[in-house]
From Swiss-Prot:
Signal peptide: none annotated. It is an enzyme of class 2 (transferase). E3 ubiquitin-protein ligase that is essential for proper development of the forebrain, the eye, and the face. Negatively regulates nitric oxide production by inducing nitric oxide synthase translocation to actin cytoskeleton and inhibiting its enzymatic activity. One of its GO terms (molecular function) is ubiquitin protein ligase activity. Belongs to the NOSIP family. This is Nitric oxide synthase-interacting protein. The gene is nosip. Keywords: Cytoplasm, Developmental protein, Nucleus, Transferase, Ubl conjugation pathway. Disulfide bonds: none annotated. A motif (Nuclear localization signal) lies at residues 78-101.
Length: 298
């Protein structure tokens, strides 16, 4: 085998490596990237700011947010919905005014045609000795094909006038949805549904700055086991305490009583937290990011 035959450009088969390389270099095809540990947030970090929470709150689906960040997000979404609703109302009023103008013009044209018909008198006396074909020879109406061609010509677009081109259509604004949705789960989100979370620090004497710099920051509120990205955790709704799922299964579910506040618990009061990423594929976290791009089809 010659040296030229060992090059990757000499093969007759389009290999998988060449396909991935061309997909990354071109602007077509869905791009897929395997995320590392550095690209996944920790279990106690906000889903919006990706920073450790100072005043954490959790949704019913287990997504943790910084209270200030999620309230600012909800306020921004409500302002955007109000702006879209204002544009929709403006379009609706403009369309209504246009329909009123058209109805008014149609009524005026009908009234004018009726008045013209009533006020018109016969200018030529009818001659009983002439045939209809002779009298109507001078005022012959155009045939049906000519009328249809003229009407079709009026409806054809003028490509040299921007307002009459087929693409020059005003984009209609759809009625916006007034519901604010969670940025992670996509479900409806309300401020009253946010539950405060109270983490139990490893050392109560360490301030917040020193706590953030440590790798192991929080422990279970009941068993004092260390919490981390690889440990399944849950939030108890009445007290907001964070405990491990092992504690929930072995201790709390026997009596269904909150060990911190003493309130009666239900199944919906035990909210499982969405865990952070460990970098391993078996951690239960989606470690693959996709970017949808145009696809070339033959």
């Amino acid at each position: 085998m010659t040296r030229h035959g060992k090059n990757c450009t000499a093969g007759a088969v389009y290999t998988y490596y060449e396909k991935k390389k061309d997909t990354a270099a071109s602007g077509y095809g869905t791009q897929t990237v395997r995320l590392s540990k550095d690209a996944v947030k920790d279990f106690d970090c906000c889903c919006l700011s990706l920073q450790p929470c100072k005043d954490p709150v959790v949704t019913s689906d287990g997504y943790i947010y910084e209270k200030e960040a999620i309230l600012e997000y909800i306020l921004h979404q409500k302002k955007e919905i109000a702006r879209q609703m204002k544009a929709y109302d403006k379009q609706k009023n403009a369309k209504k005014a246009e329909m009123d103008e058209l109805n008014k013009a149609a009524k005026e044209s009908q009234m004018k045609a009726f008045l013209d018909k009533e006020m018109t008198i016969v200018s030529k006396p009818l001659n009983p000795f002439t045939r209809k074909s002779d009298s109507g020879a001078d005022t012959a109406e155009p045939s049906g094909s000519q009328q249809s061609s003229e009407e079709k010509g009026k409806q054809l677009p003028s490509f040299w006038i921007p307002s009459l081109t087929p693409e020059a259509k005003t984009s209609l604004v759809k009625k916006p949805d007034k519901t604010v949705y969670c940025p992670m789960s996509g479900k409806p989100l309300k401020m009253k549904d946010l539950i405060p979370v109270h983490f139990t620090a490893v050392d109560e004497k360490v301030d917040r700055v020193g706590l953030i710099n440590r790798q192991d920051r929080y422990v279970c509120a009941v068993t004092r086991d260390m919490l981390g990205n690889s440990v399944p955790c849950a939030v108890l709704r009445p007290s907001g305490a964070v405990v491990t799922m092992e504690c929930v299964e072995k201790l709390i579910k026997k009596d269904m009583i909150d060990p911190i506040s003493g309130d009666k618990l239900h199944e919906r009061d035990i909210i499982m937290l969405q865990r952070g990423g460990t970098g391993f594929s078996g951690s239960g976290v989606l470690l693959q990011a996709k970017e949808a791009r145009p696809v070339m089809q033959a």
